[in-house]
From Swiss-Prot:
One of its GO terms (molecular function) is dITP diphosphatase activity. This is dITP/XTP pyrophosphatase. It catalyses: XTP + H2O = XMP + diphosphate + H(+); dITP + H2O = dIMP + diphosphate + H(+); ITP + H2O = IMP + diphosphate + H(+). InterPro entries: dITP/XTP_pyrophosphatase, ITPase-like_fam, RdgB/HAM1. CDD domains: HAM1. It comes from Burkholderia mallei (strain ATCC 23344). It holds the Pfam family Ham1p_like. GO terms for biological process: nucleotide metabolic process; purine nucleoside triphosphate catabolic process. The keyword Nucleotide-binding applies. Coiled coil: none annotated. Keywords: Hydrolase, Magnesium, Metal-binding, Nucleotide metabolism, Nucleotide-binding.
Length: 210
């Protein structure tokens, strides 16, 4: 598989994105487009969500990429990402999407955010970071997948702010920008986020693909 991003008229690469999350799809469509790569969401090809049984982001990302590639016969890229709070021993971590559900509550962004704020009620250290791992496989059994990561530092605030983004964005305040992730417009977020950093690292390695 070759990936060219020399000019808008050049043949663009086409790979499967192993996610059906609407928020992630919006972000990745914009981010990959800047790299000259067209993505096809796995849902459009009838691919189901892969299991995420692992305790690390990189293992989950690889499992999802291999699942999508095996089902479609195409190269695939997957991310596994989440919010990590050092004061909570890294939680929510790989369980970010179902943080509240694991505590017997509903599975939703609102429930996750409420539970996070509750867990930090008596905690002074509000440092947090979003973490993203991208895994790209040329085929399902690729022995040398490309792995890239990105980290976005911030802190957790009690009151939600902003109407953009998804997940924990309304509570994730970025001191360097003076705003929560949800207060950033999509272009600003895509320039600074953990996914943007991971993608830049991945794009820098695309020449390794033959």
């Amino acid at each position: 598989m070759t990936m060219s991003h020399a000019s808008p008229d050049a043949a663009r690469s086409r790979i499967v994105l192993a996610s059906n999350n609407p928020g992630k799809l919006r972000e990745f469509a914009a981010l990959f487009s800047t790299a000259g790569i067209d993505i096809v969401p796995q849902g459009e090809l009838g691919v189901s969500e892969a299991d995420e049984p692992h305790a690390t982001f990189v293992e989950n990302a690889l499992a999802k990429a291999r699942h999508a590639s095996r089902a479609t016969g195409l190269p695939a890229v997957a991310d596994d990402s989440g919010l990590c709070v050092p004061a909570l021993l890294g939680a929510p971590g790989v369980y970010s999407a179902r943080y509240a559900q694991r505590a017997g509550r509903e599975k939703s962004d609102a429930a996750n955010n409420a539970y996070l704020v509750e867990q930090l009620r008596e905690v002074a250290d509000r440092r947090a970071y979003y973490y993203c791992v991208l895994a790209l496989v040329r085929h399902a059994d690729d022995p040398e997948p490309l792995i890239a990561e990105g980290r976005w530092a911030g802190e957790i605030v009690d009151a939600p702010r902003g109407a953009h983004g998804f997940g924990y964005d309304p509570h994730f305040f970025v001191p360097a920008l003076g705003a929560t992730a949800a207060e950033l417009d999509p272009a600003a977020k895509n320039a600074a986020s953990h996914r943007a950093l991971a993608l830049k690292a991945l794009v820098a390695r695309l020449g390794e693909i033959r």
